[in-house]
């Protein structure tokens, strides 16, 4: 009887979805066939800007809502201004799309207008003749409640985890058979199955099994690893892929770094090279706050060995990097050989002569590795005191090696912070950032969308008194590009502009970068200057033509960017011949 009742549920209420991204509605009209256009995205309703809004776009809205066509495409908030986010701007439809979400636009929540420009439509009174009652959104909860009841089952599941009391659950084969992801369970011969899971994953097993019923599950920072592990073990490929995509989203949301380190260990244990590379990349861009966190002493040797060779590693200075390694070595168990391999990766030429001299007095590592430090210091002093053409001629140094190139140094010597927000927001973000991690970035009054600053021409001590002037600018509009003398196209905005008014040394080149900051403290992407401009990715993965940041920014927008100057010797320069 129970199985017959379950079957009737499936036959009467097909489908499992309620409101979805891209669903639309009309609001504030005098009748049902007119109103302000609102579209659903990520759990919220928002409006559409009237830039480029025309009858083809309005047709898409009206047809999706059951009307034959649109008679008017209205702008300037004809049905009153809306509230919440402006979801789409510069929409361009062909008229045949099923939703505005399928049309060309700037992307989700990327807009240059306010609610005074909300788009509206008037649809024809004629409908397609179809009137739909759709209660399918209730099915997911109904099926979930069937699992919660633990009644009328024909499959019994014993869940075991070391250190945990066994968990006894039951399921309904009929429901499981409708879900291909549950195949590993419903294909079991007999009426019972044993699930062996890690002890840490026992708390999420019930949610995992319920997902096979409701097709819905809440994934958090604390549960994503275990759900990914269970999905991988039991062939729930959609859940596995979803959790895999969430890793990049969740990594920046843990200022303690427990999650990135836990996921790195998980990736190493399971041989997941993509997740391992993702964790290493995030930790390299956020290396300095990692070294200042309580998690620093728990970082495994293999991870530090993966981080130190990277040029795109963000830290105040090379000296601070070496001090962090020194501190780590006193709080962890690492072999003499492992420590030597780590010190070999430190770029001694990027430290000034005075800093090199003081190492013998300030580092606990120095005495145990004195010969290595002396050799590396001599290499660095040659770099600082001998002109590049002489080094190339007599020493045969390969100046293209990473040891002679800077990393992403975030101190004021080599970088400047550019804001893209109001002064009030700047002050908030600055205070939040420096409460979490002290980088010594100086007074907040200096932080705005235009920055003039100076850096040495080159890290060599030979250039200590030779400064080069830079101007960095956040360019959100075509007007701002014209104001500051940049040539831009609307498709590339916003961008970061960088110019120099100083004479450039023909033996020196620059590989300058922009650190994209989310919430003022997490680096979620790094972009390169192509000529005088560096692209700014979108904060979220949208249907925009622009590339999203490698790690999504949950706030939906970036408010600060750190411009980093990276000089290097041009070894093929004619001045060196």
Swiss-Prot record:
Residues 24-124 form the SRCR domain. Disulfide bonds join 49-113, 62-123, 93-103. Glycans are attached at residues 69, 125, 362, 398, 543, 572. SUPFAM superfamilies: POZ domain, SRCR-like. PROSITE patterns: BTB, SRCR_1, SRCR_2. Keywords: Cell adhesion, Disulfide bond, Extracellular matrix, Glycoprotein, Secreted, Signal. Residues 1-18 form the signal peptide. Induction: Up-regulated by TNF and IFNG. N-glycosylated. One of its GO terms (biological process) is cell adhesion. GO terms for molecular function: scavenger receptor activity. Its main location: secreted. It is found in: Secreted; Secreted, Extracellular space, Extracellular matrix. Residues 260-360 form the BACK domain. Gene3D superfamilies: 1.25.40.420, Potassium Channel Kv1.1, Chain A, SRCR-like domain. Residues 153-221 form the BTB domain. GO terms for cellular component: extracellular space; membrane. Detected in embryo, liver, spleen, kidney, lung, heart, intestine, thymus and lymph node. Homodimers and homomultimers. The multimers form ring-like structures with a diameter of 30-40 nm. Binds LGALS1 and LGALS3. Binds ITGB1, COL4A1, COL5A1, COL6A1, FN1 and NID. Interacts with PPIC (in vitro). The unglycosylated form interacts with PDE4DIP isoform 2/MMG8/SMYLE; this interaction may connect a pericentrosomal complex to the gamma-tubulin ring complex (gamma-TuRC) to promote microtubule assembly and acetylation. Promotes integrin-mediated cell adhesion. May stimulate host defense against viruses and tumor cells. This is Galectin-3-binding protein. It comes from Mus musculus.
